């Protein structure tokens, strides 16, 4: 699980052998949320409100690079 960024204590990670939709794992202490890279919504999990806003803003600003990373680490998933 490469963590590709740490922002204000939030680890932004992309896993290999993961599942669709393309997403990142945002981890902050005991909290973890999966954020859809395209839709910018939480698929599952939870983060404190202020940390959720920071993580979602990061995903929005880096959407294309995150999609590329997701598909590189998950070559068996067809790009949509």
Predicted regions and their residues:
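N-terminus-biased detector of the onset of the functional/mature region
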Residues: 1, 44-56, 80
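Generic secretory/membrane-interface signal
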Residues: 2, 17, 30, 56, ...
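Short, charged/polar N-terminal "headpieces" of proteins
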Residues: 1-20
